[in-house]
Amino acid sequence: MRWNTFWGILCLSLLAVGTCQDDAENIEYKVSISGTSVELTCPLDSDENLKWEKNGQELPQKHDKHLVLQDFSEVEDSGYYVCYTPASNKNTYLYLKARVCEYCVEVDLTAVAIIIIVDICITLGLLMVIYYWSKNRKAKAKPVTRGTGAGSRPRGQNKERPPPVPNPDYEPIRKGQRDLYSGLNQRAV
């Protein structure tokens, strides 16, 4: 009974400590890129007396919650940005480094996956169509008939044709000579 009470008190105290801790505010800047312009949105709630700084230098005439950077340049406009009010601290910085282009389109992961799957399905479909088309074409083709009798030479007028004249460019194989290529399939040496 004592152990149950001990474990119960321990669990309640751990829960109480976990709920009473001060959670640090997790404020996040919002970045929106459209064409060659980049828009930063300040995470602070107040709209009054907002100031923007870039790399420690205050940006003049930028007191709105949204900071729009037209014709963003990766070299000139990249750096640390912070928005703050005189009453708040400058403790949440945003490091911005972006590449922009005028005619870029952002594609998410699901769109890329769908494009790849559709491409594979179309390719496999075309392969199946070509396979069945060629299979049907072979079945409809006339079989190749050979001449009468054994062998592939046609019989008839060419029956009395003499054997071809040996080519003088090649030397005939001598029977007494045992070279590497002097005969075919002669395994007994």
Swiss-Prot record:
SUPFAM superfamilies: Immunoglobulin. Residues 157-174 are annotated as: NUMB-binding region. It is a single-pass type I membrane protein. PROSITE patterns: IG_LIKE, ITAM_1. InterPro entries: CD3_esu/gsu/dsu, Ig-like_dom, Ig-like_dom_sf, Ig-like_fold, Ig_sub2, Phos_immunorcpt_sig_ITAM. Phosphorylated on Tyr residues after T-cell receptor triggering by LCK in association with CD4/CD8. The modification Phosphotyrosine is found at Y170, Y181. Residues 143-189 are annotated as: Disordered. Part of the TCR-CD3 complex present on T-lymphocyte cell surface that plays an essential role in adaptive immune response. When antigen presenting cells (APCs) activate T-cell receptor (TCR), TCR-mediated signals are transmitted across the cell membrane by the CD3 chains CD3D, CD3E, CD3G and CD3Z. All CD3 chains contain immunoreceptor tyrosine-based activation motifs (ITAMs) in their cytoplasmic domain. Upon TCR engagement, these motifs become phosphorylated by Src family protein tyrosine kinases LCK and FYN, resulting in the activation of downstream signaling pathways. The TCR-CD3 complex is composed of a CD3D/CD3E and a CD3G/CD3E heterodimers that preferentially associate with TCRalpha and TCRbeta, respectively, to form TCRalpha/CD3E/CD3G and TCRbeta/CD3G/CD3E trimers. In turn, the hexamer interacts with CD3Z homodimer to form the TCR-CD3 complex. Alternatively, TCRalpha and TCRbeta can be replaced by TCRgamma and TCRdelta. Interacts with CD6. Interacts (via Proline-rich sequence) with NCK1; the interaction is ligand dependent but independent of tyrosine kinase activation. This is T-cell surface glycoprotein CD3 epsilon chain. It comes from Mus musculus.
